[in-house]
Amino acid sequence: LKNLNVWGDGGIITTDSDEHAKRLKLIRNHGLIGRNECVEFAYNSRLDSVQAVVVKHMLGKIDNITKSRISNALYLDDKLNGISEIDIPKRNNDVKEVFHLYMFRANKRDELQQYLISKNIDAKVHYPIPMHLQEAAKKYGYTEGDFPVCEMAGKSVISFPVHEFVTKNDLDKIVDHVRSFYGE
């Protein structure tokens, strides 16, 4: 649901389990049964009325939003293909990707990001420190090298927006500057 933007935080959980549904309803509302009986400490995870109105409106646009994101991502796939210093993920025709972000692995990722930012391109690095190397995970005893693929991704993945407001001109600018950075 990251592609369905509301004006703040929101989310959705679906289940076909009555047991799970009952528990989820309980924990979304402070663990309250009725108004005055708290059977479990929990958070307020309900959408407020304004958020609910925004979500209801946006749900009617989700198909177009998704089509736009897919189109933008596949356009970048096509235009960036062949640049030797980047690795675009292989797409599986049996999987419908909706592209919250467009991501690929890049050699000299940090330098590329700084170059693109200097050209006013919204290039981001998400999750540069893998979860197993975060302070919160120290108690589990993981060390660098335990998850090499994850660590490599943390050091090389860069992302770009492909939301419905990105234009072909914006995408071409990304492509031109990535090619320019790598001298291709």
Language model region names:
Residues 1-23:
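Active-site PLP attachment segment
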Residues 16-184:
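PLP-dependent aminotransferase class I/II
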